[in-house]
Amino acid sequence: MVLSQRQRDELNRAIADYLRSNGYEAAYSVFKKEAELDMNEELDKKYAGLLEKKWTSVIRLQKKVMELESKLNEAKEEFTSGGPLGQKRDPKEWIPRPPEKYALSGHRSPVTRVIFHPVFSVMVSASEDATIKVWDYETGDFERTLKGHTDSVEDISFDHSGKLLASCSADMTIKLWDFQGFECIRTMHGHDHNVSSVAIMPNGDHIVSASRDKTIKMWEVQTGYCVKTFTGHREWVRMVRPNQDGTLIASCSNDQTVRVWVVATKECKAELREHEHVVECISWAPESSYSSISEATGSETKKSGKPGPFLLSGSRDKTIKMWDVSTGMCLMTLVGHDNWVRGVLFHSGGKFILSCADDKTLRVWDYKNKRCMKTLNAHEHFVTSLDFHKTAPYVVTGSVDQTVKVWECR
């Protein structure tokens, strides 16, 4: 590449400035003479630090070029392997594709949870910055911030209509928000430590919460009263999730177990113990996936003629396990993540499992063949949460890198 006379002169002056400002006096004198430079104060100011600036911007551009090349290679690979352009897929087989549709910034601390609204085209994110943010996932627009908690917001949950949002926090409270007026309508106190998980029960009448105080509590939406406490875990309860009809709740804990409770009696129906580290996350299988799970695992159909219920768990032991709750059996273990598994759920088509982890990836698993079929390098830091839209082709992820990303499925 040939430089013009002006470019050559600028480069020489920048080199001369670098040599002089870094104390290479002898080299500076020789170079100045050889390059026939006439240095003066006005010009000196213009070229001060220019060489370093050019150098760092070249490195930045190189990094950007490498990122774009890798995205291009992923797109080529997808095209040749019969991806979205190569063939028409059944929507039940749509999976998230790189690159992300939107990377949304606004939180000032790690994102702890992301969820889709059940009705409108919005999603909600919670963060360690003590706020909850609302975004439009179709346009990528930021809508509003909900403030009220005084410490990290750990989990959020909508009721089935999307009119109510529950949140819980390290400030030891649970808050209920009117999602139409965006106001906090109730604050519930009762846990003695960080409240790490919250879920509105399917009937919409009760909220269930889990805490570092080792308990699970059930609250009445109408009054905010605590009506039940489930005890049994020996350490911090990380997550709690009700099944589809609200008769059972599942919980997971630092005590390395997953427990399933009968809501009506508070009885622990099953204690699932095969993980070798803290269990971070759980997710119930939708009934639409029961037949394909039974087929894939050869699990017995009970006397009632109905398989299931089935449950997924993700752990710091880097594995994902699938359980048959009725027998307490571990049906399979999926191995592939290189760090703590932080989020796991079933694809709405019922054939796949999606997971995210501290290895910065979002993964899609074909559980019938027990293999990871797609790995997306989703974030710059740990991926803390994911959600899959029930009807629209979108996945959302949140990360310690403070961003929320929207992924299109096709």
UniProtKB/Swiss-Prot annotation:
It is found in: Cytoplasm, Cytoskeleton; Cytoplasm, Cytoskeleton, Microtubule organizing center, Centrosome; Cytoplasm, Cytoskeleton, Spindle; Nucleus membrane. The modification Phosphoserine is found at residue 109. PROSITE patterns: LISH, WD_REPEATS_1, WD_REPEATS_2, WD_REPEATS_REGION. Residues 7-39 form the LisH domain. Residues 367-409 are annotated as: Interaction with DCX. Residues 1-38 are annotated as: Required for self-association and interaction with PAFAH1B2 and PAFAH1B3. Residues 56-82 form a coiled coil. The modification N6-acetyllysine is found at residue 53. The keyword Membrane applies. Residues 1-102, 388-410 are annotated as: Interaction with NDEL1. InterPro entries: Dynein_regulator_LIS1 (IPR017252), G-protein_beta_WD-40_rep (IPR020472), LIS1_N (IPR037190), LisH (IPR006594), PAC1-like_LisH-like_dom (IPR056795), WD40/YVTN_repeat-like_dom_sf (IPR015943), WD40_repeat_CS (IPR019775), WD40_repeat_dom_sf (IPR036322). Keywords: Acetylation, Cell cycle, Cell division, Coiled coil, Cytoplasm, Cytoskeleton, Developmental protein, Differentiation, Lipid degradation, Lipid metabolism, Membrane, Microtubule, Mitosis, Neurogenesis, Nucleus, Phosphoprotein, Repeat, Transport, WD repeat. Residues 1-66 are annotated as: Interaction with NDE1. One of its GO terms (molecular function) is protein heterodimerization activity. Disulfide bonds: none annotated. GO terms for cellular component: 1-alkyl-2-acetylglycerophosphocholine esterase complex; centrosome; cytosol; microtubule; microtubule associated complex; nuclear membrane; spindle. WD repeats lie at residues 106-147, 148-187, 190-229, 232-271, 274-333, 336-377, 378-410. The keyword Transport applies. Belongs to the WD repeat LIS1/nudF family. Originally the subunits of the type I platelet-activating factor (PAF) acetylhydrolase was named alpha (PAFAH1B1), beta (PAFAH1B2) and gamma (PAFAH1B3). Now these subunits have been renamed beta (PAFAH1B1), alpha2 (PAFAH1B2) and alpha1 (PAFAH1B3) respectively. This is Platelet-activating factor acetylhydrolase IB subunit beta. It comes from Bos taurus (Bovine). The lineage of its organism: Eukaryota, Metazoa, Chordata, Craniata, Vertebrata. The gene is PAFAH1B1.
